[in-house]
Amino acid sequence: MKEGIHPQVHRAKVHCACGESFETTSTRKEIKVDVCSKCHPFFTGKSRTVEVGGRVDRFKKKYGL
């Protein structure tokens, strides 16, 4: 392997939107994610509510049309 061409690997702290955090290795020191194994429906066994309606419906609701 060549010297000096590989990125530095650090212990990275991963922060989820649900408030959970854990450590892993990465080239970044801090990582922010939207979903982790503590809050993802596949791992929790709970289903999420699926938003009914498309973009047009959301636009009309947002602007009162």
Swiss-Prot record:
Cofactor: binding comment: Binds 1 zinc ion per subunit.
A biological process from GO: translation
Keyword Magnesium belongs to the record: no
Pfam family, one: Ribosomal_L31
Cofactor: Zn(2+)
Keyword list, A-Z: Metal-binding, Ribonucleoprotein, Ribosomal protein, RNA-binding, rRNA-binding, Zinc
Record GO terms (molecular function): metal ion binding; rRNA binding; structural constituent of ribosome
InterPro entries assigned to the protein according to its UniProt record, in alphabetical order: Ribosomal_bL28/bL31-like_sf (IPR034704), Ribosomal_bL31 (IPR002150), Ribosomal_bL31_A (IPR027491), Ribosomal_bL31_sf (IPR042105)
CC per GO annotation: ribonucleoprotein complex; ribosome
Ligand binding (Zn(2+)): 16, 18, 36, 39
Stated family: Belongs to the bacterial ribosomal protein bL31 family. Type A subfamily.
Assembly information from the UniProt record: Part of the 50S ribosomal subunit.
Function: Binds the 23S rRNA.
Name this protein carries in UniProt: Large ribosomal subunit protein bL31
Organism: Heliobacterium modesticaldum (strain ATCC 51547 / Ice1)
